[in-house]
Amino acid sequence: MLLRNILHIPETHAHFLMPVLQSSGGHQVSMQNTILWNLFIQSIDKLLLYLMTCPQRALWGVTMVQLIAMIYKDQHVNTLQKLLNLWFEASLSESSEDNESNTSPPKKGSGDSSPMLTSDPTSDSSDNGSNGGGSSGKKEGCDERRQALREGTEATLQEVSRKGHDYQNAMARVTADKPDISEVASDSFEVPCSPQQHLNTEEAMDDIDYEEQVQEYEQEAAAVSSEPLNLSQPANNVNYTTNAVYASTTATETQTTSSLCAMTSLCYEPFKPPAPLPTRRNTLSEMLSDNYTSHSHVSAVKLGQKSSHAGQLQLTKGKCCPQKRECPSSQSELSDCGYATQVENPESISTSSNDDDGPQGKPQHQKPPCNTKPRNKQRTLMSPQDKKELRRKKLVKRSKSSLINMKGLVQHTPTNYDISNLLKEFTVDFLLKGYNYLVEELLKQLLTSAKVLIDTSHFFWLVTFFLKLAAQLELDMEHIDSILTYDVLSYLTYEGVSLCEQLELNAQQEGSDLQPYLRRMHLVVTAIREFLQTIETYNKVSHLSEDDRLRLHQLQLQIGATTDLRCLFVLLLRRFNPRIHSKQYLQDLVVTNHILMLILDSAAKLEGGQTIGLSEHISQFATLEVMHYYGILLEDFDNNGEFVNDCIFTMMHHIGGDLGQIGVLFQPIILKTYSR
């Protein structure tokens, strides 16, 4: 409860000055980020997962949900989705090369690996993914993972202390003198491999050599040498400068072969910048001497902001890939626990990393290579089915792993990107090991503990926020089998009707605050949307067992027979009020109703399914008032997205075509959009 209350404290407008950067004029740091960073360094994630799964979890289940909500209050689901996509894409490239020729274990004494890892703590011994066998095997596997989690929790604090000490010694060795090229290169082989690392030999193929990093650093210095450096600029500006410079070097990274040949005599040939200037010094030695002298501190700040491991570039062979600043996602309404409903289409829940507005390339928070073997084979193309299978095996490894995850370094200034990567790691572990237990416990207390005051919005948010990520990862059903149940859907339906009634009563009273009811109402709709969307996603998953498919089959039949769920959206659309409800809420209503119609249509075709009169049900939407609300949403046709517009046109098509009630569509707000 103390941690929950601390994280609930709002940020002040005063600048929080890190002691390390006091000499440079100050650096604005989020106190929330600093607290989270320090908590995860002390392995708060291990403790939380243990408390969620221990037999006494009922005593603090509600408080645990509130703490999780506070941890994620500044995180957007879009950001985590993109980071998880990159995490998967990086592992796919490694696995495809491992399948070609890698049969030898990594060298134990290799110095290319960092002692601080944040991703993929998997063991090759658990590579055989299960297809969801018997229930006894699942129970034994859960017990083994729980025991491994407890053992990992006990050993983590000692490991953190030791590795933090090693990091400080390594940083002192690097920054003691002005390093030349040979010294920096030698430093990259002085850190021993951690015994917990099981890194594949071929991973070095995905990272450029150190000489290419010198070339990138050289181009960065050339780009910024023509303008004065502002050491007191905010963190965002420094990070933006770094991103812009690295984005300009993308073309040079693609010419690996020619770059390696040219770098053999780089120290003796003049450096040629992209736009030569007569007054610019053009030798590598001059550039390195100037930049290590005058810009060493700024470079350290930039590297610290790009990665959770400050100084990692000096110690290991890492990849400095170009980063694009993410566009801020649109927010509509915020819940009590900080969840922001996003304007998204179901297509955005794809597991491919094709988004243009996210960070590209291999993320900095992935594990570095542990091998200097040159690339000798071209990467084989993988089918989508093979990619899904490799990703599934990666998650199976992660769920069975008892290795220690190092989430960061002690002396580091965390940025928002660092915290997002930190929570990406915790999200994977949470979904695999704690999410199922937490939702099950909270629902039990909501249904039985009438005397305990529980904010229902936390339950709605848990379903909305994390079920989207679980569907993206395509977790095995055993990890979400307590969420995808008819009891959960029935409770959401009941709360939807109850909140609609409470909102109507309070709206009639002058001076009453409607925001809590509007937030909960919106979260109920999005929770049902994610529930139904997850069913649609898992119907297309190929690795489900027969028991899991039978469970999904039964759930769809139950949804088809539930008239209250269908009538809920008729009620909510008819009671929509443009004066108090947002357009985002209307969009979520229309999209969720469309997904429900698809499930009802497919449920009627299943074996044992009841005949559902969809035409009779759709006729309840064929009113001037409801179609006027559809017209309000259609006004923003250009920005809605393809799926949202498809939901609108499908309903209008059935009303005007199948039902023949075209008169309800003859409204100025609809005709005006069609006439454009």
Swiss-Prot record:
Region feature Disordered, mapped onto this chain: 94-145, 346-398
Gene Ontology CC: one annotated term: replication fork protection complex
Keywords, in A-Z order: Biological rhythms, Cytoplasm, Nucleus, Phosphoprotein, Repeat
Signal peptide: none
Bias (Low complexity): 101-129, 360-369
Keyword check for Nucleus: yes
Intervals of motif Nuclear localization signal: 388-398
Pfam families listed in its UniProt record: TIMELESS (PF04821)
Modifications after synthesis and translation: Phosphorylated with a circadian rhythmicity.
GO terms, biological process: DNA repair; DNA replication checkpoint signaling; entrainment of circadian clock; replication fork arrest; rhythmic process
InterPro entries referenced in this protein's UniProt entry, alphabetically: Timeless, Timeless_N
Region (Necessary for normal circadian rhythm): 77-108
GO molecular function terms listed in the Swiss-Prot or TrEMBL record: DNA binding
Compartments where located: Nucleus; Cytoplasm, Perinuclear region
Role according to the record: Required for the production of circadian rhythms. The biological cycle depends on the rhythmic formation and nuclear localization of the TIM-PER complex. Light induces the degradation of TIM, which promotes elimination of PER. Nuclear activity of the heterodimer coordinatively regulates PER and TIM transcription through a negative feedback loop. Behaves as a negative element in circadian transcriptional loop. Does not appear to bind DNA, suggesting indirect transcriptional inhibition.
Family in the record: Belongs to the timeless family.
Subunit structure comment from the entry: Forms a heterodimer with period (PER); the complex then translocates into the nucleus.
Domain notes from UniProt: Contains a 32 AA domain highly conserved between species. Deletion of this domain leads to long-period phenotype and arrhythmia.
Protein name stated in the entry: Protein timeless
Organism (species): Drosophila hydei (Fruit fly)
Lineage: Eukaryota, Metazoa, Ecdysozoa, Arthropoda, Hexapoda
